[in-house]
């Protein structure tokens, strides 16, 4: 499957829908997004979609790795960190402090 096909797949559309719902100042893990999009074992696929995302309407900087690690951001981890800092999140090294307080989870699948 090509990158373009993956971006335009029904799963990708569900992922974009989930990520758009993450409010400023909150984050979700790749696994959280995968589960909300109906494929709980597809965290890596979500990570790949986030890495490739160039759409300004999708706040992909709000999707982080397990345990609150920043994860990649298309090679721009410093930018991801600065965007999250601007939204009020705090860090210890490359981990979000008090992930449980800022973690957003969609209760139902899309």
Q: Where are the regions that the model predicts?
A:
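Nucleic acid-binding interface residues in structured DNA/RNA-binding domains
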Residues: 1-110
């Amino acid at each position: 499957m090509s990158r373009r096909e993956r971006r335009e797949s029904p799963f990708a559309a569900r992922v974009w829908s989930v990520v758009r719902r993450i409010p400023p100042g909150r984050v979700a893990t790749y696994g959280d997004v995968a589960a909300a999009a109906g494929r709980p074992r597809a965290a890596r696929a979500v990570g790949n979609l986030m890495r490739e995302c160039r759409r300004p309407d999708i706040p992909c900087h709000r999707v982080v790795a397990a345990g609150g690690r920043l994860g990649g951001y298309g090679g721009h981890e410093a930018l991801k960190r600065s965007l999250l800092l601007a939204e009020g999140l705090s860090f210890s090294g490359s981990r979000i402090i008090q992930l449980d307080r800022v973690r957003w989870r969609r209760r139902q699948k899309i």
